[in-house]
């Protein structure tokens, strides 16, 4: 199969993966309106073409939290990454490090912090949820520090799990789900051998290190579901600050008032995000929410954005709307599922190539020169 864009990786991943895994990554909440708008709203933003600008000295490099990034992209935290490729978190982290960008480890990764951090030559980021079991949270923070993690991504838009109806149809949940998953694995032998057999253990590594006595993935997911905390408030972030003195990014901001509160709290960054359309259907796409948030807090806090980014052109659009850096999730996961570490490396090279073309043809020699003047019109204007 010819791979020329991230959408090709999606098609390849759909063929290779058991349906319960593909649709778990691909799906969103409820009727998936926000999931679709994340992509379509970005695609509807027209770039302003400029020519004859002598773009021979173009640079994608940027600085974020005392890190140099080869381009303004980081790999987003994606749960269960190790179910999409053998020891998937390790492979994705290596690809990100090789390209000179951060990898963000999810709380609910298959591989533990201690397995991934030594595999790369730059500090990874770590994502954490607010959970009822504060002992686990403290343990995770201590282990992240010990592993050399510098930047914490604190997810605040998941006090309760979203209603993901597609999971019941695909076999991730619903009637006879375990039997359906076994059958799907049997009918996808390449995945069954590479990940299902050779990718063991299949537990949530960061949680199993804390709980001990592994009992299986379903048990850990059940424990996690019972530990999401709807009482989350800014006081919980104050508690986190007692244990974390490095950069803290608050992920899940869609409103300018919440962004202002993040500045007051003293956060180092925010991620404008609707969790990839996986939490509350009907909320704004990240592209639609970003301009007002940038108007409110740009310069006071670092602004990251995710949800709907499928190409280097989309990265340029998000930067023009006000982001300093973007996170990509599904795009890298499909590449990982298809060709492992090599797939993610190739995807990042595609993103970089697409960004370079877009910057040359919009007259932006550096990331700082990508502004709203790079757009013909903003979304909704």
UniProtKB/Swiss-Prot annotation:
It is a peripheral membrane protein. Residues 1-380 form the FMN hydroxy acid dehydrogenase domain. One of its GO terms (cellular component) is plasma membrane. One of its GO terms (molecular function) is FMN binding. It is found in: Cell inner membrane. The keyword Cell inner membrane applies. Its cofactor is FMN. FMN binds at residues 106, 127, 155, 251, 306-330. It catalyses: (S)-lactate + A = pyruvate + AH2. The keyword Cell membrane applies. Its EC number is 1.1.-.-. It holds the Pfam family FMN_dh. Keywords: Cell inner membrane, Cell membrane, Flavoprotein, FMN, Membrane, Oxidoreductase. GO terms for biological process: aerobic respiration; lactate metabolic process. Homotetramer. Catalyzes the conversion of L-lactate to pyruvate. Is coupled to the respiratory chain. NCBIfam families: L_lactate_LldD, PRK11197.1. Belongs to the FMN-dependent alpha-hydroxy acid dehydrogenase family. This is L-lactate dehydrogenase. It comes from Pseudomonas entomophila (strain L48). The gene is lldD.
